């Protein structure tokens, strides 16, 4: 009896995972910028429309830097990179937010936000181009669409598994479904996110070079970021969506050397 129940549990879980796999296989496409196959169930255009509202709300709610020279600097570097990114037709916008956060972000559709806190780390425009190039790299890499698609595919499989578990009255159905969810998060979704971060670094370095900036300054910037983070508690890489600074610097340096970039 126990063996039969265990086999039923396994079949139920496998059925849910199989459903997610069918969705995943149906949506796989090759990204021409990277040569990597991606799960793309939604388009960048659809996400751009959804993100437009978020961008407008952010501009209305967040305080922005009013120093015209700072705004011109960020917008100038950003537009120069965007023009050489292969995505020049996209309606790019660049905003500088008045916050101590050491961060920057990009929304689908070419909306880039840079925080005042991170500007203090830049020694030159090449390092500013490192960050903006990285954000543009996420767009060129179709990472937002891929991330959403991964979540859709994972949720399809999880939903089927949860329903089947409940209908078959499997013992500890809620606990098993919860564990399955954690497994998908740490085993599938987060590693892809780290892959996207490394990919955005590489694409960003290429965009920097195309825009006339020194790609070697990407390594210098992350060295400075490491020093800034020295007093902060960092999560273990396995539990994080971002590569650790040390691994990031090593990967960037290897790529810059491999590409033979010079100032």
Which residues are covered by each model-predicted region?
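A Zn2+-metalloprotease active-site environment signal
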Residues: 2-263
């Amino acid at each position: 009896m126990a063996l039969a129940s265990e086999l039923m549990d396994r079949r139920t879980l496998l059925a849910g995972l199989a459903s997610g796999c069918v969705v995943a296989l149906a949506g796989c496409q090759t990204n021409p910028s990277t040569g990597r196959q991606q799960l793309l169930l939604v388009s960048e255009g659809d996400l751009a429309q959804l993100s437009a509202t978020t961008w407008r709300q952010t501009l209305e709610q967040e305080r922005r830097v009013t120093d015209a020279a700072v705004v011109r600097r960020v917008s100038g570097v950003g537009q120069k990179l965007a023009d050489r990114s292969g995505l020049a037709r996209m309606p790019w916008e660049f905003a500088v937010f008045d916050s101590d956060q050491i961060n920057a972000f990009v929304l689908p559709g070419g909306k880039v936000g840079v925080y005042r806190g991170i500007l203090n780390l830049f020694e030159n425009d090449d390092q500013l181009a490192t960050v903006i190039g990285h954000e543009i790299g996420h767009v060129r890499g179709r990472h937002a669409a891929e991330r959403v698609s991964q979540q859709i595919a994972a949720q399809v499989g999880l939903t089927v598994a949860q329903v089947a578990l409940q209908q078959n009255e499997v013992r500890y159905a809620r606990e098993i479904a919860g564990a399955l969810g954690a497994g998908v998060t740490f085993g599938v979704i987060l590693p892809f996110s780290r892959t996207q971060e490394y990919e955005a670094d590489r694409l960003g370095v290429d965009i920097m070079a195309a825009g006339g900036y020194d790609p070697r300054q990407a390594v210098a910037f992350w060295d400075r970021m490491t020093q800034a983070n020295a007093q902060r508690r960092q999560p273990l890489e396995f539990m994080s969506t971002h590569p650790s600074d040390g691994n990031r610097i090593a990967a960037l340096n290897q790529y810059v050397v491999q590409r033979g970039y010079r100032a």
